[in-house]
Regions:
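Flexible, acidic/Gly-rich N-terminal and inter-domain linker regions that tether
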Residues: 3-149, 153-231
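Conserved non-cysteine loop/helix-boundary elements of the Radical SAM core domain that shape
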Residues: 132-149, 169-192, 204-320, 324-385
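A conserved beta-strand-loop-helix scaffold within acyl/acetyltransferase catalytic domains
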Residues: 518-575
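Conserved active-site alpha-helix within GNAT-family acetyltransferase domains
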Residues: 618-637
Length: 642
């Protein structure tokens, strides 16, 4: 008690209980108690409940209100910055645990060349989106204005405790490449303008009305606020000027994603995507059966899918695909074979995948078929069985599962996949199964390092042998991996294996050093390498994707020609490191050290295989980092002469 009183006096400031904001008082109390003993979420709930009872507040203070009070005290210089308190109060910390925060924006309603029978077609929404979806609702409320959408989302993230200086911008809505060319360019320019000017905004909150909906269980928050200086905000005159400014902006776009259909993955569009600094494509694949695609009016073929993904690889893009189990004409065998096919066909093998189990919603042809008893919707048992089998038997360690279900409110779903927490339920059931069956768990873990070779760091690494179409060759520099101990992940994908909150801070002086793991597999362009730093159980800290193109599969653009290897992604799964100049933590040093180690290994493999250049499809602000590693900007790629 004496120690607590000491810290309370240390952090407290004189106040009049009749006039002081009670949330300020509560923040000071939380800081004081955390100084004595680190608080967890349960402790925080107890403190808030006791405080509300003592102060006779009408309800328990929400974390959003406390975060606002914290920032007010910080702004008034009455407290010092406290990372632990910010993390404790942060809403949905997982949104920034992968190292970035995602901002989704939607384009305006516009016709789509497809006539998919499962797609909703609301009059005032882009094709396939429903106005009650959280992201779509935010776009509709902001009249699909890209600047307003970004401002709104960044403000929401900031007020819920997330740093927004590293942003993955995701452009959704209809078939973007079918829109007029000027609109596509202006939309992207506006995204850069919004990020460049967000820090200049002057925001006024009416007292006592922080949010329209202040429930802590709500996914999205709409803030009542007024932007008082919008008329004085100056935007860039050109796209290139906006991109250049973003290199040093406080809120930087580190990745830009757009959606497309297979028939739009042309050389012309690939070049345009790079000029907009697009780094990732999401492609609607849906099925690997031509009869299923035709029955659902997709109006493209499996061969077009294969050719499109081949083209994306040639240009060095990172890509995601969408798969829809349960489409009209489905069987379990066809749905399962689709997953087997995409990870055995060298033309597919996606970096990322989204499961979108088919749902029956109104305003669709599929709904009419369902009403006529011509379509039998998926059951939850069917979906869980398929997910379970693909997790345990198919999904490889180099891919990432981004979603298991689409974010459509259950109230909008007439039949089919309508459990919004399907991912959580499936993961929990699989965890119980693996805990009770060690042999099955060991079988899953063994697929992490199938037929691996263990070498030491002194051995010259030369990887020249080709792989079979569905084979993964693994080389480990470090210690023998642990294939026995139970771990929390139930799938081998990179998202399941992120280090997240399980890690302890690490530096080069620690006894235990992560292994350097090199997984090689075959693609249609030629040889792919997934190079990562992992602990002995397979949890990922850092990774990169290296592509060695066949000499006959190269394109002549920006030094992407013969004898040029490609880095398609360099990613760090560590708590977001802020880009502020005054932050000088061990975390930042780790990022630079391990990033350079991954680059060094990619360069070594490239040189050993007689490649003369290494080209990186880099984010805008990362150019400075690559320049320090002796890379130069050539066209829209960073290139190093080996």
């Amino acid at each position: 008690l004496q120690e607590l009183l000491f810290h309370w006096k240390k952090y407290a400031i004189p106040y009049n209980s009749d006039t002081m904001n009670p949330y300020h008082e509560l923040i000071l109390q939380i800081i004081a108690q955390n100084s004595v003993q680190k608080l967890n979420l349960d402790d925080l709930k107890d403190i808030k409940r006791d405080f509300a009872k003592k102060q006779k507040l009408p309800d328990i203070p929400t974390n959003i209100k406390l975060l606002r009070a914290y920032h007010e005290l910080l702004s008034d210089k009455k407290i010092e910055k406290n990372i632990e308190i910010e993390s404790l109060l942060k809403k949905r910390a997982v949104r920034s645990q992968s190292g970035i925060v995602a901002v989704q924006v939607l384009t305006k309603p516009y016709p789509c060349p497809g006539q998919c029978i499962f797609c909703p077609n609301e009059q005032w929404m882009p094709k396939s989106y429903i106005s009650s979806e959280p992201g779509a609702m935010r776009a509709l409320l902001n009249q699909f204005d890209p600047i307003k959408q970004v401002y709104n989302r960044l403000l929401s993230l900031t007020m819920t405790g997330h740093q927004t200086d590293k942003i993955e911008m995701i452009v959704l809505g209809g078939t973007r490449d079918f829109y007029p060319n000027d609109y596509r360019i202006d939309f992207i320019k506006n995204l850069y303008d919004a990020c460049n000017t967000f820090s200049q905004l002057e925001i006024k909150f009416p007292k006592g009305t922080e949010t329209v909906n202040d429930s802590e269980n709500t996914d999205e928050y709409r803030f009542k606020y007024e932007l008082t200086n919008l008329d004085s905000i100056q935007y860039s005159d050109t796209l290139q000027e906006a991109i250049k400014k973003n290199e040093t902006a406080e809120n930087r776009i580190i990745g830009l994603t757009v959606e497309t259909r297979p028939e739009f993955a042309t050389d012309e569009n690939c070049r345009m995507w790079r000029e907009l600094w697009v780094t990732r494509l999401e492609m609607w694949v849906q099925s690997m059966y031509d009869d299923i695609l035709e029955a659902n009016h997709r109006w493209h073929t499996v061969q077009q899918i294969r050719e499109a993904i081949h083209k994306l690889r040639q240009y060095g893009f990172k890509f995601s695909i969408h798969i829809m189990p349960g489409l009209y004409g489905y069987t379990y065998e066809k749905d399962l074979w689709t997953f087997q096919k995409i990870y055995s066909d060298p033309f597919i093998k996606p970096d990322e995948i989204k499961y979108y189990p088919t749902s029956v919603v109104q305003n669709t042809v599929l709904y009419d078929l369902y009403q006529k008893w011509d379509y039998k919707p998926l059951t939850i048992d069917y979906i869980q069985k398929l997910i379970r089998q693909t997790f345990l038997e198919i999904i490889p360690p180099y891919t990432r599962i981004k979603r298991l279900i689409r974010d459509i409110p259950a109230t909008e779903i007439t039949a089919g996949s309508n459990i919004t927490n399907l991912s959580q339920l499936t993961h929990n059931e699989l965890k119980k199964e693996l805990k009770s069956n060690p042999d099955k768990a060991k079988s899953l873990y063994s697929r992490l390092y199938w037929d691996y070779e263990l070498v030491d760091s002194e051995k010259l690494l030369k990887i020249k042998d080709n792989c079979e179409s569905d084979e993964i060759k693994t080389t480990i520099i470090g210690e023998k991996p642990d294939l026995e101990s139970y771990r929390n992940f139930v799938c081998l994908d990179t998202r399941s294996r992120e280090i997240r909150n399980k890690y302890e801070k690490w530096n080069k002086q620690d006894e235990t050093v992560p292994n350097l793991v090199i997984r090689q597999y075959q693609s249609s362009v030629w040889r792919e390498f997934f190079i990562s730093f992992e602990d002995l159980q397979g949890y990922i800290y850092w990774f990169t994707r290296l592509l060695l193109p066949d000499l006959e599969q190269t394109i002549e653009r920006d030094w992407l020609g013969k004898y040029t290897a490609l880095i398609r992604e360099l990613h760090i799964y560590w708590q977001l490191v802020w880009l502020k100049e005054n932050v000088d933590s061990n975390d930042q040093k780790q990022h630079h050290w391990f990033g350079s180690q991954l680059l060094t290994m990619a360069e070594q493999i490239s040189k050993d295989n007689w490649y003369k250049n290494l080209s990186v499809i880099s984010w805008v602000w990362v150019r400075k980092y690559y320049e320090k590693q002796w890379y130069s900007l050539v066209g829209t790629y960073m290139v190093k002469w080996l």
